[in-house]
Amino acid sequence: MLDIISLGWGSLLAIFSFSIALVVWGRNGF
């Protein structure tokens, strides 16, 4: 149960940080 929750949070943080990176790169024009 804890493994599933931690895995869910890990993937959520990964997608969140990845989306932020895309926004930053988009504003900087790559």
Swiss-Prot record:
It is found in: Plastid, Chloroplast thylakoid membrane. The 4 large subunits of the cytochrome b6-f complex are cytochrome b6, subunit IV (17 kDa polypeptide, PetD), cytochrome f and the Rieske protein, while the 4 small subunits are PetG, PetL, PetM and PetN. The complex functions as a dimer. It comes from the Eukaryota. The keyword Chloroplast applies. It comes from Gracilaria tenuistipitata var. liui (Red alga). Belongs to the PetN family. GO terms for cellular component: chloroplast thylakoid membrane; cytochrome b6f complex. Keywords: Chloroplast, Electron transport, Membrane, Photosynthesis, Plastid, Thylakoid, Transmembrane, Transmembrane helix, Transport. Pfam families: PetN. GO terms for biological process: cytochrome complex assembly; photosynthesis. Component of the cytochrome b6-f complex, which mediates electron transfer between photosystem II (PSII) and photosystem I (PSI), cyclic electron flow around PSI, and state transitions. This is Cytochrome b6-f complex subunit 8. The keyword Repeat does not apply.
